Regions:
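Short amphipathic alpha-helical interface segments
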Residues: 2-49
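A short, charged, amphipathic alpha-helix used as a generic interaction element across diverse proteins
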Residues: 47-57
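A short, conserved structural fragment
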Residues: 55-65
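Minor-groove-contacting beta-hairpin "wing" of winged helix-turn-helix DNA-binding domains
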Residues: 66-71
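Short, amphipathic alpha-helical interaction segments positioned at domain boundaries
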Residues: 74-85
């Protein structure tokens, strides 16, 4: 599966334990997303368009209204990267 650079960055952070918090309008549509790393930092690569592409490909999911996290398919499709610590 072809994944863009921004999608890859977001998916990698989600696979390491990050989450995507979302805000909904009154009609139920998501209008704002913020991606947090597991350390609590905000990832600027996570835009609404990147979020919708990951959601359409079923690489992320949410359970019971909780923040979005990487799905098992998303964890399998993310390429290995060196974690810079």
């Amino acid at each position: 599966m072809n994944i863009s650079k921004h999608e890859q960055r977001v998916l990698h952070e989600l696979a390491l334990g990050g989450s995507i918090h979302h805000e909904r309008l009154e009609n139920g549509k998501i209008h704002d997303v913020t991606c947090y790393t597991r350390e609590g930092h905000v990832l600027t690569d996570c835009t609404l368009s990147v979020f919708t592409r990951l959601l359409k490909r079923r690489l992320i999911r949410s359970k019971n209204g909780a923040p979005y996290r990487a799905s098992p398919l998303g964890i399998k499709s993310v390429r290995a990267q060196m974690n810079q610590r």
